[in-house]
Curated annotation (Swiss-Prot):
Keywords: Disulfide bond, Hydrolase, Protease, Serine protease, Signal, Zymogen. The gene is Cela3b. SUPFAM superfamilies: Trypsin-like serine proteases. This is Chymotrypsin-like elastase family member 3B. Residues 28-267 form the Peptidase S1 domain. Disulfide bonds join 57-73, 156-222, 187-203, 212-243. GO terms for cellular component: collagen-containing extracellular matrix.
Amino acid sequence: MLRLLSSLLLVALASGCGQPSHNPSSRVVNGEEAVPHSWPWQVSLQYEKDGSFHHTCGGSLITPDWVLTAGHCISTSRTYQVVLGEHERGVEEGQEQVIPINAGDLFVHPKWNSMCVSCGNDIALVKLSRSAQLGDAVQLACLPPAGEILPNGAPCYISGWGRLSTNGPLPDKLQQALLPVVDYEHCSRWNWWGLSVKTTMVCAGGDIQSGCNGDSGGPLNCPADNGTWQVHGVTSFVSSLGCNTLRKPTVFTRVSAFIDWIEETIANN
């Protein structure tokens, strides 16, 4: 196991994780179109219906063979594929990689409860049926060290193809929005999220910018001290009152709380 984990780390380091070839500009409500391939670990998780595949969630490529997404994005009754290197949905731009997912290669956290999203553990891993080919449009995400907590106001970006407004349309092109981190002390206040937020989550936004339906499972991208980007969050839920409700920031599964589970799942499969 230790050998495997070391090799995974070496793969990430050798590929230059978290360093997009196309720098991001300084679904996503009131966001903006992302620079093409500026979040090259962003994936589109798609499910099959009536003979065609449809975007349902985002995700992050964390090794050439594994994607990190949300537990609520996964249903064992569905057939999935992952699209890497995507920018504009429905348009073949030449850099996409479409990779099928085998039914037995969906790994949802064992403590995830689909009837209680606020209970936490909304995280899953998807094993690709073949390895991703890394390049300008497809690169690996860096993950944060286990246990790392971002400070209040840390500047992070959500990215995805989620709805542009509550009950609004899905965008064709990848969107991004700046969502400053809201620390647990603030996010758990009674007039914010209260008891719905756990310490294994991270909040970000809470004003006019937020995630929305279709962004689920995608990354919260945060700058690290070494100049790389790290995926600190997996998009989990927003308020039932609307995607951009005041004092209801987007809630993410905190990746640094699940590093051990991620490493063990990859090592054992």
